[in-house]
Amino acid sequence: MTAPAGIDPRGPRFAAWITSALLLVATVLGLVAGSSPTSISFGWFAYQPLADATYISGDFAFIAGRPFWLQILLLRAAQPAFILTFVIALLFLWGVLSPRTQPWSLLFRTLVRPRLAPPRELEDPRPPRFAQGVGLLVVTVGLVLHLLGVPWALPIATAMAFVAAFLNAAFGLCLGCQLYLLLQRAGILGRAPRLP
């Protein structure tokens, strides 16, 4: 088995800067919005409706008239922190499935790398790709738990992913890459490449 062609190690760090900025914004949005809604408030009314009257909400056209559990689910999914984290999860998925066509990779290759000196050494692309998968797992768990109504699940998940992305961007410490190497040494992931 031959090792795949190496990548410029500055590329994943560049992508980690952008990802950490997005994750920081998602974390702040999640903290500002608070925990996920568990009830629907229709605001203040000038009259008291009859006890047996049924009120159908008109707050959002796509929510009105739906079952209560679906209304709550749609309200949770419409929060800005959820939407941004969902976009970040899609970017992580893109990085796992096709790292060469991921937007941050294209941006680095077309705008940044031509202005830099060639790298001294190339890096195995498998650990950074695995790290993208770990990031995808963490934010996906946060998204699912948020939809299920677990308080603070989304900002905690985005904060964890932010810490990992920031460590990679600022210090070159890729936690997902370290996990990949640990699992590789344990024989769980592939085989360690043999040195000639």
What are these regions (language model features)?
Residues 1-196:
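Membrane-interfacial helix-loop segments of redox and metal-homeostasis proteins
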